[in-house]
Design a protein with these regions (language model features):
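Conserved P-loop NTPase motor core
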Residues: 1-582, 588-627
Length: 627
């Protein structure tokens, strides 16, 4: 069995300079993209299109013929007809671009165009999105369209057994989350013993090697990445690590000693934080050596001792309950920062997870030993063809080109955007902010206008819930702890008088439909209660209102002591905490500065991860091992 994927050599300085020059000199031609609209009038039969696509590739003529068939299938099975702008978006994706489409413009329907066209051409298509909920929803929604074209569709979800996964990956089109497919790829690498080489695979098959029949995927042929900036940028700061448990009993005392020593240190005197990472002072290093001296064993080496204690300081101060993780059923479960969802089968590495378990006084799980690892940057660059779509990509257009060779094509809206942005309000203290949030909700609720309130953490959403209860305002809560009724809550969020409080679970991919009469009330009103590290995530929240030409309104009600400002604009934020309400210009400047610094720090982290990942890959390749 062949396992097609791209083999990219490591780039040098001159290569990166050439890439930058190509970005500056090249541009997406709007005129060229719009030619697909005329080509979609073709009336070629399905079987002829299928045969010619496999033989001739994605020419304008054949893509137009395929799009015409897909549009007809969607209209027949779903009563949905692709708009011209969706044809343009689909053509951009098919050409290996990232289509930037305004939120609410129908990316799910747009995706059927390149996905079905590539599948008709015989490519194994992966439609990759940010979570299982969206993957399953979109696969089931568009299944009738694909089946009308004679194509099979499947959906990979967490908890599936290998045999079930293997069968689903044999479908023409597979919907899945970015984490599920990346871990399945790493499992295949373990099965194959490293990078799959075509010649070696053929020789192995002739020699009776059965490993090819045990792999899950059919290679990395054609990927369409939904919410591409979230997957390719926001989640690219952390490597994907396939691991196996190690006996925890032998290491438990080491973790307990590390926490005990860390708690004995004093901030500023013994340690400080730089870029949110703990660092020991000279006095701190001496104090650690003094406390570790009687312990012996692994504590004998000063560098190792300092590393243990720094990790314990990270667990104590950088990771907060109900923000970064939940304690559920006696276990520490990670909350995905970008989606607001739980990741119960994931754990932090290098003993951090065990240190947090001890901090929370729950049963200790075994540290996990790394079997294989890869970054999203390296994984997605291995696809033979990758395209994508999102509502927010312009801010990171250069990084998308430099890392993935993805150009951003901005697609116009089908109807004018009627979303109204109210001026930001930045208060000096959180108490004043929450009072203003309650008052804004009360005013909208009195007018029967539905309200969606976005928070960054479970703790913040539950704090607001208590305030709403005290104000006797009815609401629904959606967060990682209260997620059982997600579809039902979202389906009612656009009804008159509804108040919905949610974390990022109600952000990307959430389509809140307005009930009859709500347009006349002004549409959905969205309140952002805390800025995210990236302005793109804020835009995604605001994009839940004013979709597809509907009216809508949004506002940000913030505080100078919110986490983002406190961490990334500490000095500036300190000037304003004594004020009740900041002047508009000062508030905008404070959060502009904080977000720029946060995004710069994340960009450095992504570059550092890619460099380290490439170096590790070179080292392991030299040693004859896989990733």
């Amino acid at each position: 069995m062949q396992y097609p994927e791209r083999d990219l050599p490591r780039e040098g300085t001159l290569d990166r300079l050439l890439v930058a020059a190509q970005y500056l000199t090249g541009r997406v031609s709007s005129k060229q993209l719009w030619r697909i609209v005329g080509a979609t009038r073709s009336t070629l039969p399905l079987e002829e299109v299928r045969i010619r696509l496999r033989r001739e590739g994605f020419s304008l003529e054949l893509a137009g013929a395929a799009f015409a068939l897909i549009r007809a299938a969607a209209e027949k099975t779903k009563g949905m007809r692709h708009h011209d702008v969706q044809l343009v978006g689909g053509w951009a994706i098919l050409q290996g671009m990232l289509a930037e489409m305004e939120t609410g413009e129908g990316k799910t329907l747009t995706c059927t165009l390149p996905a079905a066209t590539a599948a008709l051409a015989g490519r194994a298509v992966h439609v990759i999105t940010v979570n299982d909920y969206l993957a399953e929803r979109d696969a089931e929604t568009m299944r009738p369209v694909y089946e009308a074209l004679g194509l099979s569709v499947g959906c990979i979800k967490a908890g599936m057994k290998p045999d079930e996964r293997r069968a689903i990956y044999r479908s023409d089109i597979v919907y899945c989350s970015n984490k599920e497919i990346t871990f399945d790829y790493l499992k295949d690498r373990m099965t194959l013993g490293g990078r799959p080489r075509p010649i070696a695979q053929r020789l192995g098959a002739l020699a009776g090697d059965e490993r090819g029949g045990k792999v899950l995927l059919r290679g990395l042929q054609f990927a369409i990445v939904d919410e591409a900036d979230s997957v390719l940028i926001d989640e690219a700061r952390t490597p994907l690590i396939l691991s196996a448990p190690v006996d925890a009993a032998k290491e438990e005392q080491v973790y307990r000693d590390a926490l005990r020593i860390a708690k004995a240190l004093t901030e500023d005197e013994h340690y400080f934080f730089e870029d949110n990472q703990p660092m020991l002072t000279e006095a701190g290093g001496e104090r650690v050596r003094e406390l570790a001296a009687p312990l012996g064993g692994v504590w004998s080496g000063p560098r190792r001792s300092e590393r243990f204690v720094l990790q314990a300081l990270t667990a104590l101060h950088n990771f907060q309950r109900d923000k970064h993780y939940l304690v559920r059923d006696g276990k520490v479960q990670i909350i995905d920062e970008n989606t607001g969802r739980l990741m119960p089968d994931r754990s932090w590495e290098q003993g951090l997870h065990q240190l947090i378990e001890l901090k929370e006084e729950v049963e200790l799980t075994g540290r996990r030993e790394t079997l294989a690892r890869i970054s999203y940057q390296r994984f997605f660059r291995r696809y033979l063809h990758v395209g994508g779509m999102t509502g927010t990509a312009s801010e990171v257009a250069f990084e998308l080109w430099a890392v993935y060779r993805l150009r951003v094509a901005k697609i116009p809206t089908n109807q004018p955007v009627r979303r109204v942005y109210l001026p930001d309000r930045v208060y000096g203290r959180a108490e004043d902010k929450w009072a203003a949030v309650i008052e804004s909700i009360r005013e909208r609720h009195a007018a029967r206008q539905p309200v969606l309130v976005g928070t960054r953490s479970v703790a913040a959403s539950e704090h607001l819930s208590k305030l709403l209860e005290e104000a006797k305002l009815p609401f629904r809560l959606l967060n990682a702890r209260q997620d059982a009724d997600e579809a039902e809550i979202v389906s009612h969020a656009g009804e008159p008088g509804r108040i919905t409080v949610a974390t990022n679970m109600a952000g990307r991919g959430t389509d809140i439909k307005l009930a009859p009469g709500v347009k006349e009330l002004g549409g959905l009103h969205v309140i952002c209660t805390e800025r995210h590290d990236s302005g793109r995530i804020d835009r995604q929240l605001f994009g839940r209102s004013g979709r597809q030409g509907d009216p809508g309104c949004c506002e940000a009600i913030l505080a100078a002591d919110d986490d983002l400002a406190a961490e990334h604009a500490t000095l500036a934020a300190g000037w304003f905490t004594h004020m009740t309400l900041l002047p508009q210009r000062a508030g905008r400047l404070l959060y502009w500065l904080a977000q720029r610094r946060a995004e710069a720090a994340h960009s450095r982290a992504r570059r550092s991860l890619l460099t380290m990942d490439e170096s590790l890959g070179d080292l392991l390749a030299f040693s004859g091992r896989g990733e």
